[in-house]
UniProtKB/Swiss-Prot annotation:
This is Aspartate carbamoyltransferase regulatory chain. SUPFAM superfamilies: Aspartate carbamoyltransferase, Regulatory-chain, C-terminal domain (SSF57825), Aspartate carbamoyltransferase, Regulatory-chain, N-terminal domain (SSF54893). Belongs to the PyrI family. It comes from Neisseria meningitidis serogroup A / serotype 4A (strain DSM 15465 / Z2491). Binds 1 zinc ion per subunit.
Length: 152
């Protein structure tokens, strides 16, 4: 029997973010500043996936994401799974939950919002409505679909 070949090399210890929708890997790298840790980061783009057709994957050597950071990922890749690796084995597999609130990640699309002209940090309340992720601005109280809100 032939041993399966990995598309992206295994890591001994760290974090694997799997099942990222194809094309979202770079956004996650940038938004979560995963390259700033100074650790080896391996990224696979448009890899074959049985459930998604194609996917991205990110492996970060020597870094473990906390629950808060992992759940922030749900805003970019709701179906992603965060695996904690130790001695080349998955020791924890986390399915993501949307956070109740998110700050300093997105910009409010409302140009009249106080978050644009005042020295305040953007802040949104996160809700799921009819299967869609919605963000309500803390300052202007307008609600937007996740896709219509730009990254900060």
């Amino acid at each position: 029997m032939e041993t399966p070949k990995l598309s992206v090399e295994a890591i001994e210890k760290g974090t694997v973010i799997d099942h990222i929708p194809a094309g979202r890997g770079l956004t996650i790298l940038r938004q979560f500043k995963l390259l700033h840790y100074g650790n080896a980061v391996t990224v696979g783009f448009n890899l074959p996936s049985k459930t998604q057709g194609s996917k991205d994957i990110i492996k970060i050597k020597g870094v473990c994401l906390d629950d808060k950071a992992a759940d922030r990922l749900a805003l970019f890749a709701p179906e992603a799974v965060v695996n904690t690796i130790d001695h080349f084995k998955v020791v924890q597999k986390r399915h993501l939950n949307l956070p109740d609130e998110i700050a300093e990640v997105f910009r409010c699309p409302n140009t009249n919002c106080a978050s644009h002209g005042e020295p305040v940090k953007s802040r949104f309340y996160v809700k799921k409505h009819n299967g869609q992720t919605r963000l309500k601005c803390h300052y202007c109280e307008k609600t937007y679909s996740r896709d219509s809100v730009a990254e900060a």
